[in-house]
Design a protein with these regions (language model features):
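Walker A (P-loop) ATP-phosphate-binding motif of ABC ATPase nucleotide-binding domains
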Residues: 6
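Conserved lysine of the Walker
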Residues: 17
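ATP-dependent NMP and nucleoside kinases share a basic, alpha-helical "lid"
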Residues: 93-168
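Small-molecule kinase domains that catalyze NTP-dependent phosphoryl transfer to phosphate-bearing small molecules
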Residues: 66, 77, 122-129, 136, ...
């Protein structure tokens, strides 16, 4: 087996990482892997099995005892033209975007054993695949030797509106609550002891605050084509 080309995309929550990664993957015919979805799937498992809840966030450590019961896979959905995530054989692409998962995922993602469990799976995907992988530690931990590293940023208000628009049931929360949650997640992601979110020295920073999708992708594809 050979390792393919790797494009690593990191950044804070709701900066548009996955949208950018999907677009690059389609353009280059690479495999797209949303690692944030993998952490969300583990979090969803914890909720479904009554291991963690809003009132018992710190119980997330108990999920470590159930990792051998968790199988995460990606399958291509032709009608949506994207890879979708499956948890133990069930499509959970929509369920992992719920506010309950959003509020708990950072507590799950900071646990070293869970990160190691998922990082190993992420590295395996690079064998015999050219991939675009987005997350928070792709360039720094998962693939420090990636062929190209991008770090995506965006204004907090823009990010909050983007996340709010993604939610199917907006009655669950308000825009201001979403923004507060994002800021809290930023602090958790940057401050965790294991694999904190950092911008690598060799990463190219892209601001996705107030730019059209067309202009953004034209700029990014120029960078990609010069590096890959």
């Amino acid at each position: 087996m050979e390792k393919g080309k790797i494009i690593a995309i990191d950044g804070f929550s709701s900066t548009g990482k996955s949208t950018i990664a999907k677009a690059i993957a389609r353009e280059l015919n690479f495999l797209h892997v949303d690692t944030g979805a993998m952490y969300r799937a583990v979090t969803l498992y914890g909720i479904q099995e009554n291991i963690i809840s809003e009132n018992d966030k710190e119980n997330a450590l108990q999920i470590v005892n159930h990792l051998d019961e968790i199988q995460i896979t990606f399958r291509y959905n032709e009608s949506e033209n994207q890879n979708e995530i499956y948890l133990n054989g069930q499509n959970v692409e929509n369920e992992i975007r719920s506010i309950s998962v959003t509020n708990l995922v950072s507590y799950v993602a900071k646990i070293p054993e869970i990160r190691s469990f998922l990082v190993e799976q992420q590295r395996q995907l690079a064998w015999n695949h050219n991939i675009v992988m987005d997350g928070r530690d792709i360039g720094s931990v998962v693939f420090p030797q990636a062929d190209l590293k991008l770090f995506i940023t965006a204004d907090a208000q823009v990010r909050a509106q983007r996340r709010f628009n993604e939610m199917e049931d907006k009655s669950e929360t308000t825009l201001e609550e979403v923004k507060a949650n994002l800021i809290q997640r930023d602090e958790l992601d940057s401050g965790r002891e294991n694999s904190p979110l950092v911008k690598c020295d060799d990463a190219i920073e892209i601001d996705n605050s107030n730019v059209s999708q067309e202009e953004l992708m034209e700029n990014i594809m120029r960078i990609v084509q010069s590096k890959i």
